[in-house]
C-alpha cells in the first residue's frame, strides 16, 4: 500500500511541476539541492545529483558539468546524450565562460562565434562558472533543443545553485 501512495505522490509531483512558474521551480529546486549537498562532501557525487535534479525538473536536452583539470575542461557528471570530453580554455561557450569567469547565456548557439557543436540538436545554452577561492574550478553547462530557452531567471538561480558547491 505504501508503494502505491509513493507512486501516486510521484505522479502528482510531476504533474504539479509542469504547471509551476520557472521561478517557483527554481525556488523548490534550490531548497532540494541545498539539503542534498549539505549531507554529502564528495564533489563528483554532488555534481551527479545536481545534474540529475536540474535535468529532470526542467527536461533540458543536456545538463552537466565540466571540471578544470590540467588547464582544460574535462567532462564530469551529466544527464543527456554523449558529450564532448575535453574543451580548451577560451573555446566554445564553456571555454569562454571559464576564461571570462562569468555566466554566458546564448539564445541561439549557431550565432555564437566558435560554438562547439557536441550535438546538432542543441539550440540554446547557458554556462555558469563554479568558483573556489576566486578561481573557476568547473562550469555547469545546460543545453536546450529550443531557441532562447534561457534568460535572467535561469542565470540568477543557476548562479545561486552553483554557489552551494
Show where each model-derived region lies.
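A short, aliphatic-rich beta-strand micro-motif
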Residues: 124-131
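Intrinsically disordered, low-complexity terminal regulatory regions
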Residues: 17-77, 160
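Juxtadomain coupling helices with adjacent low-complexity linkers
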Residues: 29-30, 34-36, 138, 144-165
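Regulatory sensory and allosteric helical modules in signal-transduction proteins
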Residues: 68, 72-118
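Short, positively charged and aromatic/hydrophobic N-terminal segments
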Residues: 6, 10-11, 16
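Cationic, amphipathic, low-complexity segments that mediate targeting or membrane/lipid association
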Residues: 1-4
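Short hydrophobic/aromatic beta-strand element in the GNAT-like acyltransferase core
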Residues: 62, 127, 139
Amino acid at each position: 500500500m505504501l508503494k502505491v501512495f509513493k507512486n501516486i505522490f510521484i505522479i502528482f509531483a510531476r504533474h504539479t511541476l509542469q504547471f509551476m512558474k520557472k521561478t517557483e521551480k527554481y525556488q523548490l529546486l534550490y531548497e532540494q539541492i541545498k539539503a542534498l549537498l549539505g549531507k554529502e562532501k564528495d564533489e563528483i557525487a554532488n555534481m551527479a545529483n545536481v545534474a540529475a535534479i536540474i535535468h529532470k525538473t526542467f527536461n533540458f536536452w543536456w545538463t552537466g558539468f565540466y571540471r578544470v583539470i590540467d588547464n582544460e575542461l574535462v567532462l564530469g557528471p551529466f544527464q543527456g546524450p554523449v558529450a564532448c570530453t575535453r574543451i580548451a580554455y577560451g573555446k566554445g561557450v564553456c571555454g569562454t565562460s571559464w576564461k571570462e569567469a562569468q555566466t554566458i547565456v546564448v539564445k541561439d548557439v549557431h550565432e555564437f562565434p566558435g560554438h562547439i557543436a557536441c550535438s546538432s540538436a542543441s539550440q540554446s545554452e547557458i554556462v555558469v562558472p563554479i568558483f573556489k577561492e576566486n578561481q573557476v574550478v568547473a562550469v555547469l553547462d545546460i543545453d536546450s533543443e529550443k531557441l532562447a530557452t534561457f534568460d535572467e531567471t535561469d542565470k540568477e538561480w543557476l548562479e545561486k545553485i552553483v554557489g552551494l558547491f
